[in-house]
């Protein structure tokens, strides 16, 4: 009897050891994935949260109309697990979207448009040149926000001294950490791809005008910057768009949007898919 009990105890110890090893393996090696693709925005787009003047109509997301002093934002409704506190892992992600900035005059356009990553409880911030995402040109770690801006209006207090319209990468401040001069093609559809490589912390932005009629002008732009996401944004974030107008204005529209992230070494696995 004692021998049988010893064998049973040994069996359960081995079983427990295998079980714990398996649980640990899956905890370390599981991948949490979030994906969605919106090719046409519906009037009652259920997976978006609208803030300010943002709304959907005629298959597109309108952030602002071409009127003065507006702020419009739209957020993906499900929070994104961008890094894992237990393992220290950071997500790789790629997002692509098409947008149009359309102003009555190509010489008087404001203020711009952003894709941003922010805390789950994010609210519209200061309008005008702050693009509805920031409140200061000074670095503010409590902002916990990273944005890619498509800036159409020069603000002397923080914009590049060349006064050109530009693409910028913003980290906890409206003053960009890196910029690329950009020739806005008024009313033309722009394709954007933003990718983050967690191994290198490099954020890459590419904008192209696929149907450009302005052959003499640059129609493709690329910008890179090291952004330590884990040190800037919370573990769980929201992603979205923001646009503003001021004394000058433009309509800011998004025509399609897709997103895919993979966070390795997490304790759970999730797949979100929306059309």
Swiss-Prot record:
Signal peptide: 1-30
Site feature (Cleavage) residues: 210-211, 217-218
UniProt entry tagged with the keyword Signal: yes
Record: residues binding Mn(2+): 149, 151, 159, 166
Residues binding D-glucose: 111, 129, 246-247
Pfam families given in the database record: Lectin_legB
Single GO MF annotation: metal ion binding
Post-translational modification summary for this protein: The mature form consists of two chains, alpha and beta, produced by cleavage of the immature protein. These remain cleaved, yet fold together to form one subunit.
Cross-referenced InterPro entries: ConA-like_dom_sf (IPR013320), L-lectin (IPR016363), Lectin_LegA_CS (IPR000985), Lectin_legB_Mn/Ca_BS (IPR019825), Legume_lectin_dom (IPR001220), Leguminous_Lectin (IPR050258)
Record-stated family: Belongs to the leguminous lectin family.
Subunit structure and binding partners: Heterotetramer of two alpha and two beta chains.
Other information: Binds two manganese (or other transition metal) ions and two calcium ions per heterotetramer. The metal ions are essential for the saccharide-binding activity.
Its biological purpose: D-mannose specific lectin.
Name this polypeptide is given: Lectin
Phylogenetic classification of the source organism: Eukaryota, Viridiplantae, Streptophyta, Embryophyta, Tracheophyta
């Amino acid at each position: 009897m004692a021998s049988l009990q010893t064998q049973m105890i040994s069996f359960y110890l081995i079983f427990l050891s295998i079980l714990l090893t398996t649980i640990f393996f899956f905890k370390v090696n599981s991948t949490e994935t979030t994906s969605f693709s919106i090719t046409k925005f519906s009037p009652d787009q259920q997976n978006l949260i609208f803030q300010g003047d943002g709304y959907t109509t005629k298959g597109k997301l309108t952030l602002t109309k071409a009127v003065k002093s507006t702020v419009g934002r739209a957020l993906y409704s499900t929070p994104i697990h961008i890094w894992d506190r237990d393992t220290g892992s950071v997500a790789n992600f790629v997002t692509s979207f098409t947008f149009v900035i359309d102003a009555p005059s190509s010489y008087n356009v404001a203020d711009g448009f952003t894709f941003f990553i922010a805390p789950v409880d994010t609210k519209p911030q200061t309008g005008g040149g702050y693009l509805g995402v920031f409140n200061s040109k000074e670095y503010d770690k409590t902002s916990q926000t990273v944005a890619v801006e498509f800036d159409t209006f020069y603000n002397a207090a923080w914009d590049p001294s060349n006064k050109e319209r530009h693409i910028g990468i913003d980290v906890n401040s409206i003053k960009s950490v890196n910029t690329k001069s950009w020739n806005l093609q008024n009313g033309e559809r722009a394709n954007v791809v933003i990718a983050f490589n967690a191994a290198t912390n490099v954020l890459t932005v590419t904008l192209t005008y696929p149907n450009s009629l302005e052959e003499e002008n640059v129609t493709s732009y690329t910008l890179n910057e090291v952004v330590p996401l884990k040190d800037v944004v919370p573990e769980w974030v929201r992603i979205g768009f923001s646009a503003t107008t001021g004394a000058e204005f433009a309509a800011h529209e998004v025509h399609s949007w897709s997103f895919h992230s993979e966070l390795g070494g997490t304790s759970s696995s999730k797949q979100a898919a929306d059309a």
